[in-house]
Amino acid sequence: MYDKYLVTGATGFLGRAVVEALVRRGARVYALVLHDDPYINLLPKEVHTVIGDVCVKNSLTDFFADADSRTCVIHCAGIVSVASRPGSRLYQVNVGGTWSVLRQCMERNVGKMVYVSSV
C-alpha cells in the first residue's frame, strides 16, 4: 500500500468506486475535482479534495505538490462520447489532460500511475 493516493475523476462512476475502496482500506486519498462539480458532496468525508482541472497545469501543480515515490496516482478523469465527431474538449481532457498528469508523475517520480480508460 502507498502512503498517499491521488485520484483524478474521483466523482465519476469508476473514480468514486476507486475512492470508496481506498477509503475502506484506510488509505489517505486526495481527489482532484472541478470547481463546479455537482457530485463533490458524494465523496466520503475522509477524502481530501483539491479543486482543479487536469487541463490546467497550475491546478495539477497544487495537486501533486507533495507527491513522491510513496504516492500512487489513479487517473480516472476523462470524457466519454458516442458522437461521430467528438469535440475539442474531449481531446483536451482525454489526451492533453492525461499527458499533463503523466508529466507530473514523471517530474515527481511517483511510485505508480494507474490509467483508467473507458474508451
Question: For the regions a protein language model found, what residue spans apply to each?
Answer:
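N-terminal Rossmann NAD(P)H-binding glycine-rich loop of SDR-like oxidoreductase domains
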Residues: 2-25
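Conserved acidic residues
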Residues: 3, 47, 71, 111
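Residues at the starts of beta-strands that form the adenosine-phosphate
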Residues: 4, 28-30, 111-113
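SDR active-site strand-loop-helix element
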Residues: 8, 32, 73-77, 113-119
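Conserved glycine-rich Rossmann-like NAD(P)H-binding loop of the short-chain dehydrogenase/reductase
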Residues: 27-37
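NAD(P)H-binding glycine-rich loop region in Rossmannoid oxidoreductase-like domains
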Residues: 38, 48-96, 104
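Conserved Rossmann-fold NAD(P)-dependent oxidoreductase catalytic core, especially the SDR/UDP-sugar
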Residues: 96-119
